[in-house]
Each structure stands twice: as C-alpha cells, then as structure tokens.
Amino acid sequence: MFDRAAMLFLYTETPLHAGSGTSLGIVDLPIQRERTTGYPMIQASGLKGCLRDAVDSDPQKVEIVFGPDTQRASDHAGALSVGDARVLLFPVRSLAGVFAWVTSQNVLARFKREAEMAGLQVNWEPIGPAPTDDGTAFVANGSGVVANGRVVLEEFAFTAQPENAVKDIAEWLK
C-alpha cells in the first residue's frame, strides 16, 4: 500500500496541549490520550492538518500530498498517511540537575518496533527485565540525575539501577 515510510520526531520547547474536544467533566478541553494506555498523544488528523497548514507551496502539490480541501474531500485521498504522535520521552523535574527525560519499558519496546517497521536501523535492545518493585529507576552509568544512589523526580524517590542499554538508547536518539 505504501512505497515509503518515515518517522517524524517532534520536540516541543513549550507546553503543548492537543485538546480532545469537549468533556462533561470539570476540565473543558482534556488532553488527547491513548485509550489503551492513557498516555498523552496527538491524533493523526490534527497532526496532518498542522503539517498541511505549515506548508507554503504550490496548491496543486499540497492537494496531491494532503488531499483536497474539506469541500472536495471525497474526490480522492492524499498521498501522505500520518499516524498518531506518541510520547517517547517526557521531561520531569529532577533534584539533581534541572530535569530528567523519563520513559517506560513498554514505550521503548513499542517505539523500537515501530521504528524498525519504518525502516530505521535500531541497534539497541529493549531494557529488561522489569524491576521487581516500583521504587527502582534504570539510569545510564554516570547519569547526572543520580545523587547518592538515588533518583528524585518531582516528589518521588527511586533507587538508581545502572543499565548499559539506557546509554545505548540515548546515543541512538542523538
């Protein structure tokens, strides 16, 4: 169905709020979240719309890539198919250093699988097995967020467990 695949990496420097429309709750526009995990995300349709708006090009080329405008949407589909944007790393305040990038083993495993499907050469293995308790955080050897064998993120303290794979993943992402 597709000739090519690529992965788009988004890095936000300011707070991002991709609202999910309306809600019956106290929050007017709750953030978009994955149904299965509850993780924050940006739905593909909103991402594709933003990309289309950002393109300042020949209208005919825009129509070929993104499809016709709303009034003629049934004419044909665009050539570009966009997936949901998902969180890979999340900045969290750290006692040692300003902040730490955090993620989970599940997020990393899914990212690796999707990156390989997009044709990227992923030369690191997922971190595992999972810690036996919730009070452990995997860190790279020599990590700047470790103080006295502990990692303090927001108000939560974890025992630092050095893991070579963390450094491998960080190097690959650079």
Residue map of PLM features:
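RNA-binding basic/glycine-rich loop and surface signature characteristic of RAMP-family CRISPR effectors
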Residues: 1-174
